[in-house]
């Protein structure tokens, strides 16, 4: 069994270099919520050195709140902003002799696109128009995945090791109790359930089905590095191969 393990990087965390030795895919911030040209270049070089698949991590323009502010923007604006960010990272990757593999939206852009078909359509169109061979990563079972499929993009359905789920398969908003899983054992058990059994237990106790093609571990988490090591060990023990 294979699984992709991804992390959001280039967001100002000291553990980026070490995480790149543990994950198979890196989602690199493109400057709208975090990062800048130099951090993008540094992350790209480190990812290439470690053989890690590189992806753009576009966001709403929200550096003040790390891309977590809800916004109502015209789809054309979201299309342009997404294209701009993908293009910026793509230029750096190309200049370093690499190939960009995927796009995964960040924060509130990701969450809103999971439920808003118009927003999802704008993002999927931007990815397709930039490079139709790129993989679009989105929340498992979301509108973003459906939009990607409509544009005939290869999609990857994502699950989260350290986030709480609602009964409909969506993430618990960060403003609500149960949004983040701080207990390492619970996060590990949830991840293995999603990957091996295709199910997740919601905060209300209801089990729901989920398709896990890639697992996200947050690079900005306090224990991200230690948890990544534990997760890799758990996968190895169960003959689950981490591969992009």
UniProtKB/Swiss-Prot annotation:
Q: What class of enzyme is it?
A: hydrolase
The question of whether Cell membrane is a record keyword is answered with: no
What does this chain do?
Catalyzes the cleavage of 5-oxoproline to form L-glutamate coupled to the hydrolysis of ATP to ADP and inorganic phosphate.
What InterPro entries has UniProt attached to this entry?
Glyco_hydro/deAcase_b/a-brl, LamB/YcsF/PxpA-like
HAMAP family reported in the protein's UniProt record: PxpA
Which molecular-function annotations from GO does this UniProt entry contain?
Answer: 5-oxoprolinase (ATP-hydrolyzing) activity; ATP binding
What this protein catalyses is: 5-oxo-L-proline + ATP + 2 H2O = L-glutamate + ADP + phosphate + H(+)
Q: Which GO terms describe its biological process?
A: carbohydrate metabolic process
Its EC number(s): 3.5.2.9
This protein's gene is called pxpA
Protein family according to the UniProt entry = Belongs to the LamB/PxpA family.
* Pfam families hit by this protein: LamB_YcsF
Alphabetical UniProt keywords: ATP-binding, Hydrolase, Nucleotide-binding
List the protein's name.
Answer: 5-oxoprolinase subunit A
How does the record describe its quaternary structure? Forms a complex composed of PxpA, PxpB and PxpC.
């Amino acid at each position: 069994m294979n699984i992709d393990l991804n992390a959001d990087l280039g967001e100002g965390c000291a553990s980026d270099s070490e995480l790149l030795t543990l994950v198979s895919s890196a989602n690199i911030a493109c400057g709208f919520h975090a990062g800048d040209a130099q951090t993008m270049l540094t992350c790209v070089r480190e990812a290439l050195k470690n053989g890690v698949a590189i992806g753009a991590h576009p966001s709403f323009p929200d550096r003040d709140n790390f891309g977590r502010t809800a916004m109502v923007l015209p789809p054309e604006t979201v299309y342009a902003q997404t294209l701009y960010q993908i293009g910026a990272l793509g230029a750096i990757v190309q200049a370093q002799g690499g190939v960009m593999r995927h796009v995964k939206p960040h924060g509130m852009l990701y969450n809103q696109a999971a439920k808003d078909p118009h927003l999802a359509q704008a993002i999927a169109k931007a990815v397709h128009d930039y490079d139709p061979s790129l993989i679009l990563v989105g929340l498992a079972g979301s509108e973003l995945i459906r939009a990607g499929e409509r544009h005939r993009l290869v999609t990857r359905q994502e699950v989260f090791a350290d986030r709480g789920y609602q009964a409909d398969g969506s993430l618990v908003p960060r403003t609500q109790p149960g949004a983040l899983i701080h207990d390492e054992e619970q996060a590990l058990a949830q991840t293995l359930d999603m990957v091996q059994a295709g199910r997740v237990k919601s905060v209300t106790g209801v089990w729901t089905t989920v398709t896990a093609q890639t697992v996200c571990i947050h690079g900005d988490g306090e224990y991200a590095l230690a948890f990544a090591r534990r997760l890799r060990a758990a996968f190895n023990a169960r003959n689950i191969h981490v591969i992009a």
